[in-house]
């Protein structure tokens, strides 16, 4: 279901609780909402009012991917970036990495399975932005 975006700082600044397999409907709402937005590349669940650690992003082929409980384990190639956000006004200057390794859970057959994956460049920046949202960091 497509949800309205939330810009309430009280919601966005609240660290997200760990997600479970029972949160699959939240993940689906996140994907539906992301796909409905023009020029959007990623969303975190708190941006649709759900304080669960779930993020979704679109790859270069516009295919949606969902990460439950994402955590950046380490990064390489630090750089300064200027980012905008769908639920915040203005541009924020942030520190990012060109390459990151992320631990996350993936929903497989109704169960969360632990995964690790490397992300580079644009996808790495998106994931870092979404992980900041999960921590309640306002960008």
Predicted region positions:
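Positively charged
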Residues: 1-139
């Amino acid at each position: 279901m497509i949800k309205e975006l939330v810009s309430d700082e009280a919601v966005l600044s609240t660290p997200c609780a760990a997600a479970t397999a029972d949160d699959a409907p939240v993940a689906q709402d996140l994907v539906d909402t992301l796909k409905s937005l023009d020029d959007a590349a990623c969303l975190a669940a708190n941006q649709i009012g759900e304080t669960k650690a779930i993020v979704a992003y679109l790859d270069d082929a516009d295919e949606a991917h969902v990460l439950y409980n994402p955590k950046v384990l380490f990064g390489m190639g630090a750089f300064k970036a200027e980012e905008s956000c769908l639920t915040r006004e203005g541009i924020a200057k942030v520190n990012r990495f060109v390459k990151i390794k992320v631990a996350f859970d993936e929903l497989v057959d109704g169960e969360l399975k632990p995964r690790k994956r490397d992300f580079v460049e644009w996808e790495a920046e998106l994931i870092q932005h979404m992980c900041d949202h999960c921590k309640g960091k306002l960008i």
